[in-house]
């Protein structure tokens, strides 16, 4: 009996052989499967890298567009505020000749022997009108006895200066200049001493 037992242990059983064969086959298949899996991982890694690069490019484009939009928004807000601030410039420029007429009328009324009531009425109208313009941001450019400033004045004539101190200074203002919110809307026409 012992002999039979030993023989059984020595002779491989068909079940054990089958299990060994399956293990060998499985390990061999795993080796074969692992090679394509490594190739697939490389292929999968490439799309991941591509998608990462695309994501970075899209983020960069997005940030640039956001910055561009922010600059556009700031620029349009500035333009709108400038338009609101100086929007009535055309209307006010067209009213400036009326001021000129008032000034001429006042200077001529002083020379005439007209009743004082007419002169007082014209002065009142002129005063109210100038107050209105001042509220709108319109100011006269002061030129009398000041050095000539080409940014504010146009020299229409040059005459010999009556004194040495008046050389290069404004002698007379032919047409008054005006600014709207510190922007020149009409240059003063002046006579300069030389």
From Swiss-Prot:
Residues 1-44 are annotated as: Disordered. It is found in: Cytoplasm. Keywords: Chaperone, Cytoplasm, Stress response. GO terms for biological process: protein folding. GO terms for molecular function: adenyl-nucleotide exchange factor activity; protein homodimerization activity; protein-folding chaperone binding; unfolded protein binding. GO terms for cellular component: cytoplasm. Residues 1-12 have a biased composition (Basic and acidic residues). InterPro entries: GrpE, GrpE_coiled_coil, GrpE_head. Homodimer. HAMAP family: GrpE (MF_01151). Belongs to the GrpE family. Participates actively in the response to hyperosmotic and heat shock by preventing the aggregation of stress-denatured proteins, in association with DnaK and GrpE. It is the nucleotide exchange factor for DnaK and may function as a thermosensor. Unfolded proteins bind initially to DnaJ; upon interaction with the DnaJ-bound protein, DnaK hydrolyzes its bound ATP, resulting in the formation of a stable complex. GrpE releases ADP from DnaK; ATP binding to DnaK triggers the release of the substrate protein, thus completing the reaction cycle. This is Protein GrpE. It comes from Porphyromonas gingivalis (strain ATCC 33277 / DSM 20709 / CIP 103683 / JCM 12257 / NCTC 11834 / 2561). The lineage of its organism: Bacteria, Pseudomonadati, Bacteroidota, Bacteroidia, Bacteroidales.
């Amino acid at each position: 009996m012992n002999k039979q037992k030993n023989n059984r242990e020595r002779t491989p059983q068909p079940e054990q052989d089958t299990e060994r064969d399956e293990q060998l086959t499985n390990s061999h298949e795993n080796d074969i499967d692992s090679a394509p899996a490594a190739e697939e991982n490389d292929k999968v890694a490439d799309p991941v890298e591509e998608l990462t690069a695309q994501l970075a490019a899209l983020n960069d484009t997005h940030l640039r567009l956001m910055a561009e939009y922010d600059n556009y928004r700031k620029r349009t807000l500035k333009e709108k505020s400038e338009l609101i601030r100086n929007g009535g410039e055309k209307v006010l420029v067209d009213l400036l000749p009326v001021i000129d007429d008032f000034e001429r009328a006042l200077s001529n009324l002083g020379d005439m022997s007209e009743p004082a009531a007419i002169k007082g009425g014209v002065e009142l109208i002129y005063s109210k009108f100038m107050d209105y313009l001042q509220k709108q941001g319109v100011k006269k450019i002061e030129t009398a006895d000041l050095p000539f400033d080409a940014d504010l004045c146009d020299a229409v004539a040059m005459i010999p200066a009556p004194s040495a101190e008046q050389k290069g200074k404004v002698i007379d203002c032919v047409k008054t200049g005006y600014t709207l919110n510190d922007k020149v809307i009409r240059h003063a026409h002046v006579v300069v001493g030389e």
